[in-house]
Amino acid sequence: MLPRDRRVRTPAEFRHLGRTGTRAGRRTVVVSVATDPDQTRSTSPSAPRPRAGFVVSKAVGNAVTRNRVKRRLRAVVAEQMRLPPLRDLPVLVQVRALPAAAEADYALLRRETVGALGKALKPHLPAASEHA
């Protein structure tokens, strides 16, 4: 489970992701990534932290199916948030499950979510020349 401070919670944050986010899709998920305006304006000394939100509509299936998909997606994203480069970026991440996610096993959901997340994160990564 993601701690409360690591989740996208407000409708305004989800709207921000929808309007300004970089999207990457696969058969089972669409991942959107946007810079977190709260953390870029903040003057707090704490390290930047990514935050994630999940959208699983009724098109995915009944409540049991939607909750299973959401639990699996949360587990995948929580794992990725502990690893670089996502760990160190002040971004908002939205993972939207598509109807095909209902039939996908954990391995497929993980593979597609990680792939889409990597593609959506590319514009938010620091340029390689900055480190040289």
UniProtKB/Swiss-Prot annotation:
Q: Which reaction does it catalyse?
A: Endonucleolytic cleavage of RNA, removing 5'-extranucleotides from tRNA precursor
Record key words, sorted: Endonuclease, Hydrolase, Nuclease, RNA-binding, tRNA processing
Tell me which GO cellular component terms the UniProt record holds.
Answer: ribonuclease P complex
Is this entry keyworded Glycoprotein? Answer: no
Gene Ontology molecular functions: 3'-tRNA processing endoribonuclease activity; ribonuclease P activity; tRNA binding
Name a single GO biological process.
tRNA 5'-leader removal
Record EC number: 3.1.26.5
Taxonomically, which superkingdom? Bacteria
Q: Does the keyword Aminoacyl-tRNA synthetase apply?
A: no
Q: How does it assemble?
A: Consists of a catalytic RNA component (M1 or rnpB) and a protein subunit.
Q: Which NCBIfam families match?
A: rnpA (TIGR00188)
Q: To which protein family does this belong?
A: Belongs to the RnpA family.
The protein's job, in short, is:
RNaseP catalyzes the removal of the 5'-leader sequence from pre-tRNA to produce the mature 5'-terminus. It can also cleave other RNA substrates such as 4.5S RNA. The protein component plays an auxiliary but essential role in vivo by binding to the 5'-leader sequence and broadening the substrate specificity of the ribozyme.
Q: What is this protein called?
A: Ribonuclease P protein component
Which organism does this sequence originate in?
Micrococcus luteus (strain ATCC 4698 / DSM 20030 / JCM 1464 / CCM 169 / CCUG 5858 / IAM 1056 / NBRC 3333 / NCIMB 9278 / NCTC 2665 / VKM Ac-2230)
